[in-house]
A protein has these predicted regions:
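Bacterial Sec-dependent N-terminal signal peptides
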Residues: 1-25
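Alpha-helical protein-protein interaction elements
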Residues: 9-10, 35, 55, 108
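Residue-level detector of solvent-exposed, low-hydrophobicity positions
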Residues: 11-15, 39, 134
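Short, flexible coil/linker elements and helix-boundary hinge sites characteristic
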Residues: 14, 19, 46-47, 147
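Mature N-terminal, pre-catalytic/accessory segment of carbohydrate-active enzymes
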Residues: 23-75
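Aromatic-lined, polymer-binding surfaces characteristic
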Residues: 53-232
C-alpha cells in the first residue's frame, strides 16, 4: 500500500512538477527537493533500533548475525544490513527518537554504509540486486539529507554510482518490475539533481499504468506478471 501511494503520488505530482520546471524554468533544486520531501513523508517512521545496535560490530560497520556471503534466492540475509542501517537513519533524523542527532549513531551509519559498499554482497535472485537493495539505499540516502550531519559526498556518490551500475534499466522490463526499478531511478535522479534521468524514470513509472494484452493491466482489470494464469 505504501508503495502504491508513493507511486501514484510521484506520477501525479512528479510529472506536474517536472513539466512546470521545463515550461517555466523554475529552480530545479526546489523541484527535486519537493519530490524528495514526498518520498520522506511516505516512508516516515520512528524505529526501535535496540536490536540493531546490539548486533552492530563497531570494528568494521557490519552486523554480527548477518551472513554476507549468502546468495540464497529468498529472504536474502545481507539485506538485513541495509534495513538496519535504514532504521538507524530514520532514528537519527526523527526528533521524537532518543537517538536523534546522536553523533555515535551517525558514525555507525557512515561506517555501515562504507562496509556495505566495500563488501558488495550479491544475490543469485536479480530482484534483490536490482529492486530491493537500490530502493532501500535510495530512500535512506534521501532521508539522510535531512540529518544534522551529512554523509561525506564521496560516500554518497559511490553508493549512487553502484545503484546506477547494478540497479538495472526499467525500459528492459514490463509491469511491476519496470515500475519498481524506475522508482529507484527517481530516487537517484533527485539525489544527483539529474533532470534527464528523472524524466526517463517518470516515463517508465507511468508506462505500466495502461491496459495491455502482455504483462501488466488487462482489459478486464486483472493484472499479469510472470505470465498468464487461469482464474480460480
Amino acid at each position: 500500500m505504501k508503495k502504491l501511494s508513493l507511486l501514484f503520488g510521484l506520477i501525479l505530482s512528479g510529472l506536474c512538477h517536472f513539466n512546470l520546471l521545463q515550461a517555466q524554468h523554475i529552480s530545479q533544486e526546489n523541484e527535486f527537493e519537493a519530490l524528495m520531501q514526498k518520498i520522506r513523508q511516505d516512508f516516515a517512521q520512528n524505529p526501535d533500533i535496540t536490536q540493531g545496535l546490539e548486533k552492530y560490530n563497531v570494528q568494521d560497520g557490519s552486523f554480527t548475525d548477518v551472513d554476507y556471503a549468502s546468495i540464497q534466492r529468498t529472504n536474502w540475509p545481507p539485506l538485513v544490513h541495509i534495513n538496519r542501517i535504514s532504521d538507524f537513519v530514520f532514528a537519527y533524523t526523527n526528533p521524537k527518537n532518543r537517538y536523534y542527532q546522536n553523533e555515535d549513531l551517525y558514525n555507525k551509519i557512515e561506517k555501515g554504509l562504507e562496509y556495505w559498499h566495500e563488501r558488495n554482497p550479491w544475490c543469485h535472485n536479480w530482484w534483490y540486486n536490482q529492486i530491493a537493495e537500490p530502493q532501500a539505499l535510495g530512500v535512506l540516502l534521501i532521508q539522510m539529507r535531512t540529518g544534522k550531519k551529512q554523509l561525506p559526498h564521496e560516500l554518497e556518490n559511490k553508493l549512487l554510482e553502484r545503484i546506477k551500475k547494478d540497479g538495472g534499466n526499467p525500459a528492459k522490463w514490463t509491469g511491476a518490475n519496470r515500475t519498481d526499478i524506475a522508482l529507484h531511478w527517481i530516487y537517484r535522479a533527485c539525489l544527483s539533481k539529474d533532470a534527464e534521468t528523472l524524466e526517463f524514470a517518470l516515463e517508465n513509472v507511468y508506462n505500466p499504468v495502461i491496459y495491455t494484452t502482455k504483462e501488466g493491466f488487462q482489459h478486464d482489470n486483472s493484472n499479469f506478471q510472470h505470465g498468464q494464469q487461469l482464474y480460480i
